[in-house]
Every structure is written in C-alpha cells, then in structure tokens.
C-alpha cells in the first residue's frame, strides 16, 4: 500500500499539473470553453496511452530502435526549449505556431508536457523495480493521471480569474521557467550520455 501511495505522489510530481496549467492555458486560450475541455481530455487520453505503452514495453521499443534513455531526455529538452522560446517571443500566429483556428494535437500538450521524457524514463525504471507488481503500477499511474486531468480541466476557471493580460504575463514567466527546465533536462541527458 505504501508503494502505491509513494509511486502515485512521485508520478503526480513528475506530471506537474500545476506547473503545466499556465502552459495549457496559454496554448488553449483562443479556444472556447467547451472545445478546450475536449482538447484537454483528448490530449490526456493520448498521454495516458503513451505512458501505458512505455510502462509495459518502453525499454523494448528503445532497444529495437537502438535508443538510450539519455536520447529521450536530450530530445525532450530540445523540444521544450523551442516551445519556451515561442512562449517568451510569441509570433502573430500564437505561441504554439498554430493559427487561432487551429489547435494542438499530440505535441506539445500530450508529449512532452504530460508524458515527458522524465516521466517515461521513470515509468520504465518503475516497471523494472516492481516487475511483479504491475497492477499496482497501473493503478498508481491512473490515479496520478486522473488528478492531473482534473486540474487541467479547471484551466478555464483560471483563464477567467487572470484574464488575457494575466495569462500573457504567466506565459512569459512560464517560458523563462521552461527554458531553465528544458536546459536542465538537456544537460542531464548529455551528462548521462557521457557517463555511459
């Protein structure tokens, strides 16, 4: 039971729903509330599928493709860095490079914001550590996923509270934080790569 609680808390912290909330708000701010909910649910379902795949066969996929976990970390850092630059210096098309009529699909919401390299690597490590307790791992993942989706579905409420200017300010602030996180993720991948 303690393992389930600690694993669930670990997964929630890595998914970081509160940290991702301003990014989700920024990317989805031009969509109406109903469409925003649909997109959040769709992206979270995609993220859950990816997480379950990595939990069960992640290491095998990387082995088949001859990729190391460091590669996942480095590439995730690069993607997040590019997203952060667009958040700090938004173009007329919007911060995610789509027009106001378009909406994100798969990248960047499902991957790498929710199902990011850190989470996918953690799931692979947990699947080795608790090889004979897979039902508990799946349960922990589902609880953490449910907690995250509830917080992200409340993004509309936060949009009403902060308004457009508040969201723009949060966007730039989160962009700065995201640049630091992505750089750290990239450097961790490089460091691990050199160690191996």
Curated annotation (Swiss-Prot):
Q: Where in the cell is it found?
A: Cell membrane
Cellular compartments per GO CC = plasma membrane
The superkingdom of the source organism is Bacteria
Name the membrane topology term. Answer: Multi-pass membrane protein
Which keywords describe this protein according to UniProt? Cell membrane, Membrane, Transmembrane, Transmembrane helix
- Grouped into one coarse class, the protein's main location is membrane
**InterPro entries for the chain:** Multi_antbiot-R_MarC (IPR002771)
A Pfam family it matches:
MarC
Family membership, please give it. Belongs to the UPF0056 (MarC) family.
Query: Mind telling me which PANTHER family this protein's record contains?
Result: UPF0056 INNER MEMBRANE PROTEIN YHGN (PTHR33508:SF10), UPF0056 MEMBRANE PROTEIN YHCE (PTHR33508)
Supply the name of the protein: UPF0056 membrane protein BUsg_434
What's the source species for this entry? Answer: Buchnera aphidicola subsp. Schizaphis graminum (strain Sg)
């Amino acid at each position: 039971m303690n393992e389930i609680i600690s694993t669930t808390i670990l997964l929630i912290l890595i998914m970081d729903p509160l940290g991702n909330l301003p990014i989700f708000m920024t990317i989805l701010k031009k969509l109406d509330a109903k469409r925003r909910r649909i997109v959040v649910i769709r992206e979270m379902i995609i993220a859950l599928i990816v997480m379950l795949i990595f939990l069960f066969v992640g290491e095998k996929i990387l082995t088949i493709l001859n990729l190391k976990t460091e590669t996942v970390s480095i590439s995730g850092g690069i993607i997040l860095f590019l997203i952060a630059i667009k958040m700090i210096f938004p173009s007329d098309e919007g911060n995610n490079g789509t027009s106001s009529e378009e909406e994100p699909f798969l990248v960047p919401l499902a991957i790498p914001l929710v199902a990011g390299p850190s989470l996918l690597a953690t799931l692979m490590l947990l699947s080795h550590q608790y090889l004979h307790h897979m039902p508990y791992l799946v349960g922990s993942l589902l609880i953490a996923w449910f907690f995250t989706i509830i917080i992200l579905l409340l993004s509309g409420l936060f949009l009403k509270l902060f308004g457009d200017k508040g969201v723009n300010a949060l966007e730039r602030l989160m962009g700065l934080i995201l640049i630091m996180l992505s750089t750290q993720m990239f450097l961790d991948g490089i460091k691990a790569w050199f160690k191996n």
